[in-house]
Amino acid sequence: MPKPNHPSGKGPAKPKAAAAEPVIPENYVDFAEQLMKENCSLITKTKIQNLLRLACDVYNNENRRTEERLLKESVNQIKLLRIRLAYECGRDSQVRQFVESANLFEYLAKLSSVGTCTRQDLIDYYHYMEALVAFHRYYSESKTGEENAS
């Protein structure tokens, strides 16, 4: 008699491997530069700066601390940041495309998981956001300069 839950009927299906936890890459500066080189026009300077500003308060609170785990208050602020990010993505498909290519939702989801994230993870996220803003400025100015020269 075939066993249920397996496509071949030979026993229970094996569980799928869990997806790897999203981690800010060690070479996040190079990653941010490449991303902005290709996707700079997807998001405005104001929108990307606002995303950084939202993360800034959490970063400032956690950067002064020495404990390894995030405060519950910080985790709640990160959840609000995810909500704001979802709102911005819903308003503008280009922002959504940028957020997806930058993996911002995945990183924030990890940060907002109570007990699984460290202060260093938040600091890395903030530095990644700073790199995105800096390279956005660099590449948007480069493109503006090229257009004016033509």
Where on the chain are the PLM-derived regions?
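Small/polar/charged residue-enriched interaction surfaces, especially the RNA/DNA-contacting tracks
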Residues: M1-S150
